């Protein structure tokens, strides 16, 4: 298996593939998706500024998918950008003939796989962090596995959860819902899960300190040791410890 770190401006990714050509396909797919998003922002700056649902006029495919997913989750379109770009990368890999391909865009993962894959659960200072992993079964369709955190990384969050991971066949939706849930969920208040759509979101795992909240259908969770060196991050990665 080939593992490659790929960065372009704000897009910071890890790509996994069996073939060098599939790595290059992923890069091309992500860059094409970025161009669509950049054109949208250039002509409509509000698209990138708002933290609320927003429907742009005549968007291209990628911005449109972001806006739809974000509107359903009640967040701004940019909450879905990492997932949308990751999906574009894996779609390009599959189009190039890949039976296995993974793009991790800063914790927002798109995956197509002909084998079992372990995805580690990293949750900052939680005592559960780095000790478990999801065991993802093989699947011919693209799967989104997106994680949001209020305590790890530079992304905007209004919550307290150490990690919220959402599974969905729509990677942009997984990304948007991870953000929305992370903004609101606490160990004592899980009412945000009542807002999840009846279809589209497969399962949710939230880690808040030493508390765990599960919703829907999740893949098996197994004991594992997460190697933090494999976490996809740029030079500005950081852990925000609680005071």
Swiss-Prot record:
Question: Which SUPFAM superfamilies is this protein grouped with?
Answer: ApbE-like
Family per similarity comment: Belongs to the UPF0280 family.
Source lineage: Archaea, Methanobacteriati, Methanobacteriota, Stenosarchaea group, Methanomicrobia
InterPro entries in alphabetical order: ApbE-like_sf, MA1715-like, UPF0280
Checking NCBIfam families in the record gives: PRK04334.1-4 (NF003324)
Q: What is this protein called?
A: UPF0280 protein Memar_1519
Per its UniProt record, what HAMAP family does this chain match? Answer: UPF0280 (MF_01079)
| Gene3D superfamilies the UniProt entry points to | ApbE-like domains
- List membrane-spanning regions: none
Q: Which organism is it from?
A: Methanoculleus marisnigri (strain ATCC 35101 / DSM 1498 / JR1)
